[in-house]
Amino acid sequence: MAFRQTLSIRSRLFARRNQPVYHIIPRESDHERDSFCQETSQRSYHSFLHQRSVNNSDFSKVSGGSLHLPLAPTSGFAFYRYMSSAPGVGSEKIGVMSDIAEVITDSTLQDVPAQAAAAVSEVTLAAADSFFPIAALQQCIDMVHTFTGFEWWASIVVATILIRSSTVPLLIKQMKDTTKLALMRPRLESIREEMQNKGMDSVTMAEGQKKMKNLFKEYGVTPFTPMKGMFIQGPLFICFFLAIRNMAEKVPSFQTGGALWFTDLTTPDSLYILPVITGLTFLITVECNAQEGMEGNPMAGTVKTVCRVFALLTVPMTMSFPQAIFCYWITSNLFSLMYGLVIKRPQVKKMLRIPDLPPPPPGQQPSFDLFSALKKMKAMTQDHTQNQIEPPSPVNPRLSSTSLSPVSKRLKALESQVKGRKKNSSKKK
């Protein structure tokens, strides 16, 4: 029985030496008492081991020698805490642990959800269900807002300028191609006139199409070159519109992210100042830059008229939009205006290697429209193929009379009757 008790005690001491457990967080007032208790525990612990080693000499003989277990100084403290039965000591330490538990429960655990929510940006939560380009624009605006510390309206303005500046090389390339198309327009008109003079038969159509293809290849453009600007500006405007509208709906800080009279960016402008400014800036941009790169194109006037009408309709159409959208729209209009004014300067055109267009002759308006000419050629080609599939049937002289008008048929019938009467009268005589 004594052997089992000794073995169990020593195994527990060995485990506590390797894995010491601290169940008490001492206070400043307990330092002296803890040091006294530690010295007492070490003395009692060594005397206890000495007594056990004397009484259990048989166990040491069986094992081939005395069992030495080197223990750390903390094991005496742990042993004393488990083996001590001093009154009042454990209750005070338990009180300390209960106080710590209350502090953790009341303050720390309540702050964890708030800290976790603050770690995730409100824009990230708003853009979680958005399409990738729209979410990327929202993150771009948020990055500008985070790194610069600007208000939301200024962050939208800066993000608009950065993204529109990145599209300038594409706009310059589109302007070069449009200018090349204007330069080759007289040659296209000469090909069209040549095709009309030759009767627009199948051989002439094939030759004209071949010449046009070679001409487009020579200048490095396509018939859809004037639409490149629409392909660039259209999707960009739609993505910006959807991104800012989503942020105005789901980002709470937009309610105080404005300035002057538009402090709340989530509501429409009750004074209608921003819609009017948007329409005016767009109209000025149209008047200054609508025909840039479209010289010699008869569609330029139509495009300018449509843009004027759209500028006037902008005010009533945008009255219900959030004010955050106008921070982008007005900035984009001003950027387009400045870009058009700069790109029209001869020095800038020379530096960017944009070819100059020859001035049109006075009193003569170009009448060639590329798209209408292509449509006419396509329609004539289809008619020609249908005629080849259905060859004309030979004309029957008997059936040709059926194609005459009813009046001519009546006249011929009367002539035959008159001739018949004359023959009958001559026979009677």
UniProtKB/Swiss-Prot annotation:
Keyword Transmembrane: yes
Mitochondrial matrix topological domain: 164-223, 291-309
Gene Ontology cellular-component annotations: mitochondrial inner membrane; mitochondrion
Annotated CDD domains: 5TM_YidC_Oxa1_Alb3
Tissue: Expressed in stem, leaf and flower.
Function of the protein: Required for the insertion of integral membrane proteins into the mitochondrial inner membrane. Essential for activity and assembly of cytochrome c oxidase.
Compartments where found: Mitochondrion inner membrane
Biased composition (Basic residues): 419-429
Membrane topology of the entry: Multi-pass membrane protein
Organism: Arabidopsis thaliana
UniProt keyword annotations, A-Z: Membrane, Mitochondrion, Mitochondrion inner membrane, Transit peptide, Transmembrane, Transmembrane helix
Region (Disordered): 378-429
Segments on the Mitochondrial intermembrane face: 138-142, 245-269, 331-429
GO molecular function terms attached to this record: membrane insertase activity
Protein's recorded name: Mitochondrial inner membrane protein OXA1
Family: Belongs to the OXA1/ALB3/YidC (TC 2.A.9.2) family.
Bilayer-crossing regions: 117-137, 143-163, 224-244, 270-290, 310-330
